[in-house]
């Protein structure tokens, strides 16, 4: 007998109020092209995350500066944003959170970082490499293009050890050509002996 499961989940994005606003459509399309996103939902998801962070910062700014909640939660929020590389260490104030843009978060995606490091020929190639499990962060293979790369993990992005790009087993075509090369050389020797 099947067991009924209740999934606890919430929406990770909010659709725009005005569906056909030309300026917004153009801006979203530009972001999709620049950062190699799959669809508008990926833009909306980042926008939603940014909105939640800014809302938290605005709420904390309404409290008194010496308020323990503002000190504790404000520092936690700032540290988190600095750790993922969205905010500079010199700008560790709540006011700077309100000035963050979507591009700041899109720059920290694994897909963008792989392209910027020169591991991929284009932003779209970076997405393919990640999905095909060729990229690792530290020792962990990551196959999610939207993975947010922390500042300390940025220098540890590299090809997977099992990937043909990273010195692992050669790919299908390379193996086929190598086999053909060995077989061709062996066949040529036999003909000369006869």
From Swiss-Prot:
Q: Its GO biological process terms?
A: cytoplasmic translation; positive regulation of cell population proliferation; ribosomal small subunit biogenesis; translation
Q: Does the keyword Acetylation apply?
A: yes
Cross-link Glycyl lysine isopeptide (Lys-Gly) (interchain with G-Cter in SUMO2) per UniProt, renumbered positions? 93, 139
List residues, modification Phosphoserine: 153, 163
Q: Where does the S4 RNA-binding domain lie? A: 108-182
Provide the GO MF annotations for this entry: RNA binding; rRNA binding; structural constituent of ribosome; translation regulator activity
Per the record, its GO cellular-component terms are: cytoplasm; cytosol; cytosolic ribosome; cytosolic small ribosomal subunit; extracellular exosome; focal adhesion; membrane; nucleolus
Cite the PANTHER family for this sequence.
30S 40S RIBOSOMAL PROTEIN, SMALL RIBOSOMAL SUBUNIT PROTEIN US4
Xref: NCBIfam families: PRK04051.1, uS4_arch
The record's comment on protein family reads: Belongs to the universal ribosomal protein uS4 family.
Q: What is this protein called?
A: Small ribosomal subunit protein uS4
- Native species: Homo sapiens (Human)
Gene symbol here is: RPS9
